[in-house]
Curated annotation (Swiss-Prot):
Keywords: DNA-binding, Exonuclease, Hydrolase, Nuclease
HAMAP family reported in the protein's UniProt record: 3_5_Exoribonuc_YhaM (MF_01427)
SMART domains: HDc
Keyword Chloroplast: no
EC number: 3.1.-.-
Name the UniProt record assigns to this protein: 3'-5' exoribonuclease YhaM
């Protein structure tokens, strides 16, 4: 079986079909234009530069284009890159479907839906349960397909649902340890906190921000969605306000994107759970591409650190 992009090591030659995830234009120090492209297959993605690009070439190499690339893998300032020697757009008879080139969550959608539904059934507060079920049903198709982000963590097909399932399991374990926590609020917060991303983001492949995403952001979007759901369900209770606060504050601080800090116990815990699961995903994926006794490439969202994989970890 042909190697995937994440399986290549520094110094190895590459001759492979990949999907352009993103393509960003820049101007080099010599004044000439270049493209920074993120290329992907189901194993992950890698950055590459296309130098001295003409307007015609720029139009060729856009997001969602499958290309045949030849080059070699290098480590540039702690980041793994693909140095391109040859590149061309793939012919129709060479490749089948874009979906063959995208990374997907390691759990089936049906299994994730079943697990999330079970957590909703465990809720005892009828207002919280009805609001959560209503909003999940409204956005379920997109929720099961979309990534949790454009980069950094869970940025793959069904990544949003996978992130939520992991967080729910964390929330359950923490609630069992600290029984004073309101499980209903915490579970609902986990399910709803990033649900606005189905409106903020463009879709599961070559994900970008929508107009609403750029102008409002997923936090504001979801606060409004909770308010609309409450009106539709004729729920006029404090639970609505608390759920809105939990979503509004889950980034923790204004400089991290939350207009208000957590002022409810469950909001504070949700912030930690979200942060923990995102960071674990980043570390696990970086370490999964690393041999024992070596360091990962730099992880930008974790203070640009390289993590060591102990030699006794196989």
């Amino acid at each position: 079986m042909k190697k995937k992009i994440a399986e290549y090591e520094v110094g190895e030659q590459v001759d492979i079909f990949l999907l352009i995830k993103t393509a960003t234009k820049g101007i080099a120090s010599n004044g000439k234009p270049f493209l920074t492209v993120i290329l992907q297959d189901p194993s992950g993605d890698i950055e590459a530069k296309l130098w001295d690009v003409s307007p015609e070439v720029e139009k060729q190499y856009v997001a969602e284009t499958i290309v045949k690339v030849a080059g070699d893998i290098l480590n540039y300032k702690g980041r793994i890159q693909l140095r391109v020697k040859q590149i061309r757009v793939a012919n129709e008879n060479e490749v089948t479907d874009i979906s063959d080139f995208v990374e997907k969550a390691p759990v089936k959608k049906e299994d994730m839906v079943e697990k999330i539904t079970q957590y909703i059934f465990e809720m005892r507060n009828p207002n919280i349960q009805r609001l959560t079920r209503h909003l999940l049903n409204k956005h379920q198709n997109e929720f099961l397909d979309y990534p949790a982000a454009t980069k950094n963590h869970h940025e793959f097909v069904s990544g949003l649902a996978y992130h939520v399932v992991s967080m729910l399991d964390l929330a359950k374990a923490i609630s069992n340890l600290y029984p004073s926590l309101d499980k209903d609020l915490l579970y609902a917060g986990v399910i709803l906190h990033d649900l606005g991303k189905v409106i903020e983001l463009s879709g599961p492949i070559s994900t970008t921000y929508t107009l609403e995403g750029n102008l409002l952001g997923h936090i504001s979007i979801m606060v409004n969605e909770i308010g609309k759901a409450a009106d539709e369900l004729q729920i006029d209770a404090e639970e609505v306000l608390i759920l809105q606060h939990i979503v509004l504050s889950h980034h923790g601080k204004a400089e991290w994107g939350s207009p208000k800090p957590p002022l409810v116990k469950e909001a504070e815990i949700l912030h930690y759970i979200d942060n923990l699961d995102a960071k674990m995903n980043m570390m696990d994926r970086a370490l999964g591409r690393t041999k024992p006794g070596e360091y990962t490439e730099r992880v930008f969202a974790l203070d640009n650190r390289s993590f060591y994989k102990p030699s006794f970890h196989n």
